[in-house]
C-alpha cells in the first residue's frame, strides 16, 4: 500500500507537526509514503528535520518506506545548504 503526501508551496513549522503525525500513522499501519516536493517554494529547517527523522523512522520500522519525489529547486537548495541531501536520499 502506497500513499502520497504533497508538500505545500510554503513548507514551514506549521506543516512540520501534521507531517510528523502523518508519518507516525503510516509507520504504524505499514503504509509506504511518497512525498511530492515539486510545489515547494520555501521550506524551513523544522520541516526538513521532520523529513529526515521520517526517513530514519521508516527505515528502522521496516516494511514501509518514505520517498521524496520531484524536489523543487528551492527544496533541493535549502536541503543542500543544510547538508541534508544525503539524509533525504536526494543525491547531489
Residue ranges and their predicted role:
Residues 1-46, 52-92:
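STAS-like cytosolic regulatory interaction modules
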Amino acid at each position: 500500500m502506497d500513499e502520497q503526501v504533497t508538500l505545500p508551496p510554503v513548507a514551514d513549522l506549521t506543516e512540520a507537526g501534521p507531517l510528523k503525525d502523518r508519518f507516525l500513522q503510516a509507520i504504524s499501519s505499514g503504509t509506504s509514503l511518497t512525498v511530492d516536493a515539486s510545489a515547494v517554494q520555501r521550506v524551513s529547517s523544522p520541516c526538513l528535520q521532520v523529513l529526515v527523522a521520517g526517513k530514519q523512522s521508516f527505515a528502522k520500522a521496516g516494511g514501509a518506506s518514505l520517498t521524496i519525489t520531484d524536489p523543487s529547486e528551492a527544496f533541493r537548495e535549502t536541503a543542500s545548504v543544510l547538508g541534508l541531501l544525503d539524509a533525504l536520499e536526494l543525491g547531489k
